[in-house]
Amino acid sequence: MASLNMIVAVNKTGGIGFENQIPWHEPEDLKHFKAVTMNSVLIMGRKTFASLPKVLPGRLHVVVSKTVPPTQNTDQVVYVSTYQIAVRTASLLVDKPEYSQIFVIGGKSAYENLAAYVDKLYLTRVQLNTQQDTELDLSLFKSWKLVSEVPTITENKTKLIFQIWINPNPISEEPTC
C-alpha cells in the first residue's frame, strides 16, 4: 500500500463543516490546501466531492459512493464503493508520473475510517468559532507526533496554524472498510 496523507482544517472546537460546506472563508487556507495537494490523488466521500465548486485541476479524485455507478468515471474522477477500493485504486494511480502523493480530504467518515492507515496529517487550526454541524474527533490523533507548526494571520485577521503530524504506528495493510 502506498503512503497515505490526510489534510483537514478545523475550527476551535473541531468543527469541519456546516451544511456540507466549510464553515469559514479564508483564502490563505485554500491556497495552502492547493499547494499541499497539487499533483496528488485525492480520496473523498461523495458529499465532499459534491461540495467542491468544480473538479480540482492538477489532481485526480477518487470518490467513495455506494450510489454513483462507475459508469460516471472521467479522466479526473473515479468512483468506488468502499474505502478499501479507494486506497487500492489511489495506490495504483499514484505510480503515474503526474501524481506524487495520496491525500484523504474528507469528509468525516473518510477521516474516521482511514486515520489509522495515514502516515502524515496536515492539520490547519482555524482560530474561529463558527457554526458547525460536523466535527472531527481530534483524539483520533492523540498518539501522533507534531513535527511542524507555522502560525499566520490572514488578511481577515484570522489566526491559522498550519501543523504537520506524523503517525508513529500506521497500519500498513489495506483498510477493510
Curated annotation (Swiss-Prot):
Q: Has UniProt tagged this entry with the keyword Oxidoreductase?
A: yes
- The first-level EC class reads oxidoreductase
The EC code for this enzyme is: 1.5.1.3
Q: Which domain of life is it from?
A: Bacteria
For molecular function, the Gene Ontology terms on record are: dihydrofolate reductase activity; NADP binding
Kindly give the InterPro entries that the UniProt entry links to this protein. DHFR, DHFR-like_dom_sf, DHFR_CS, DHFR_dom
Is Oxidoreductase there in the keyword field? yes
Q: Which family does it belong to?
A: Belongs to the dihydrofolate reductase family.
Role summary: Key enzyme in folate metabolism. Catalyzes an essential reaction for de novo glycine and purine synthesis, and for DNA precursor synthesis.
- Tell me what this protein is called: Dihydrofolate reductase type 9
* Source organism (scientific name): Escherichia coli
